[in-house]
Amino acid sequence: LSTAAQALMPKPQTTMQPQTVTIREPVVPRDLVYGRTRKGGVIVFLHSSGPSNEHLDLVIVLATHRVKSIGAIYFEGEVALDADGTAQGRWAGKVLVEKKLGIANQTAFAGLQADLPDKWTEDHQLRGCAAIRLRLTYDQDAFPGGIPNITVDLEGKDDIWDPRTQSAGYSENPALCLADYMANPTWGIGARIGEPDGIDEMSLVEAANICDEAVPLTGGGSEPRYTCNGVITLSEAPKTIIEGMLSSFAGRCAFSAGSWRIHAGAWRAPDVALTSDHVREGGLTLATRVTMSSNFNGVRGQFVSPENDWQPDDF
């Protein structure tokens, strides 16, 4: 394997962290969302209005790209608005929402523009960014602690190219998600699918097919062999991001014969059978990665679990 390929094979440096906090900072790295997740965002607009400043308007950017859907909205982990935008429980009549998926030609939040025309104009379009606008109306029972932590269910990036269908759309296929990231010239490495010095299309198709293989479940039914669901923070180096995405499908990425070749982890039929006739006189010497005394006999892992309120959970 080439030096570039070897560089993409170490243990990923990324840490397992929940993304369920909404922040207010002047400068933050952008987020990419692949697959399904629940996450916070960045408050880019905050303004109070009304005779007693009882209304609080917030605009929260969730992702740096177009997404498939923005679902239910949570205040401090409780459903405040369902996927249709209907306020629930004690928040009924106290909160409303507008959603923008981040399409290229999206317009400004119409409700916010109507409510605060001198603060939010038709030029505030947030094109290319998925975002929500919330209006909170003060109520002691609804907001006893002030502004709640706000999180949102998302189905992420939905312009991922699939060479098998020659079309773009939403995908949880990790090989396709990795190729989408690597192909981006702004935050990836500009390795476009099927182009010189880009991603080899045949190897990508093979990897994508492996990821989509149906694996039977002990309780019945099946699930894809590998899926990709999570958030990428673009403050990380491309090498670190690629390593982390490769780990989601036991993958390897090699630069060979002028192209990047993506391989998914799966059993493959051997090309050749080695026998004693292939061994040089003197035998073999096996050098393991770790000594026998420091070897392991068990593995524990973590993943961000939807069943555990999108917090890290053990396998």
Spans of model-derived segments:
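Surface-exposed fibrous attachment elements
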Residues: Q13-Q17, R268, N295
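Acidic, small/polar-enriched beta strand-loop surface segments
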Residues: H65-S69, S276-F315
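Residues in well-ordered beta-strands of folded domains
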Residues: Y74, D153, H263, Q302-V304
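Short helix/loop capping segments that flank catalytic or ligand/cofactor-binding pockets
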Residues: A83, A254, H263, D271-V272, ...
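Polar, S/T/G-rich
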Residues: S2-S247, S256, D309
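Solvent-exposed coil/turn segments that connect beta secondary-structure elements
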Residues: E78, G265-W267, P306
